[in-house]
Curated annotation (Swiss-Prot):
It comes from Homo sapiens. One of its GO terms (cellular component) is cytoplasm. PANTHER family: MUSCLEBLIND-LIKE PROTEIN, MUSCLEBLIND-LIKE PROTEIN 3. It comes from the Eukaryota. One of its GO terms (biological process) is negative regulation of myoblast differentiation. It is found in: Nucleus; Cytoplasm. This is Muscleblind-like protein 3. Belongs to the muscleblind family. Highly expressed in the placenta.
Amino acid sequence: MTAVNVALIRDTKWLTLEVCREFQRGTCSRADADCKFAHPPRVCHVENGRVVACFDSLKGRCTRENCKYLHPPPHLKTQLEINGRNNLIQQKTAAAMFAQQMQLMLQNAQMSSLGSFPMTPSIPANPPMAFNPYIPHPGMGLVPAELVPNTPVLIPGNPPLAMPGAVGPKLMRSDKLEVCREFQRGNCTRGENDCRYAHPTDASMIEASDNTVTICMDYIKGRCSREKCKYFHPPAHLQARLKAAHHQMNHSAASAMALQPGTLQLIPKRSALEKPNGATPVFNPTVFHCQQALTNLQLPQPAFIPAGPILCMAPASNIVPMMHGATPTTVSAATTPATSVPFAAPTTGNQLKF
């Protein structure tokens, strides 16, 4: 995680005191130590009816002879100290909020950069490079979806995402037990002290919604004194199971509290791309930067010969058109008969199909 340190800037607003207007007129009957407003001397700088107190004076270390800041009396000094503590709390709160916002911005930037890889290889501008056999097919690097583990991936710094359709293991509740269905039918061969399910003697204990009974926690602690308790009193082997389940729940809660929020979050597996022709679904992993590097690599190219039948035209002049991507070549007058030239046309027409 990136730590963001914000320097605390000294703010002089909390050091500002209002000047007594009666003192400015020379009619204030209260002394400096009694008036709730400031009585600054002439050397102090007063602006808009306010004066700034001397910070060094609050610490008891001002050595200036004619200080332009106010040296407040004890009662105003106490007020300024309270203002200073409140201002420090506000600055720390603002710094913490700023650091949290910066952390969220960094996390969003990291997540947005994951989806910025090109999805298709770039085709070079050179025509022969368009038929480059070294350009990887867009389907290269695709992994079948069944080879990807179904377990979620843990990565740092991402906001937690919901996992639709993910069902975790069913945890045993520490205050309820499932009733034995065989016992309800009257054909349970296991005894009350051997069956892993509850054998309640009173049918009113059973909750019809989930077929469970509520455990009497006082009985487990050995202090149930009710004659007809409406809760189930489990045998010893079921008590051991309940205590183990309770311990497991406490351990899981402690482990969850140990993780910092935002450190490890679950993200779902990337959804597969369904093929319309019924082929195996695939997904695109983050290998496109390697694919892009191979695409931009300039390699020597072999001559391109298109597949299928080739249609040739008889030359009408001394310019013979060559294959795609090559430059036209000027040839001299033919010294051999036209029938020996591979591109010559027969007498029946000017087209020849190989």
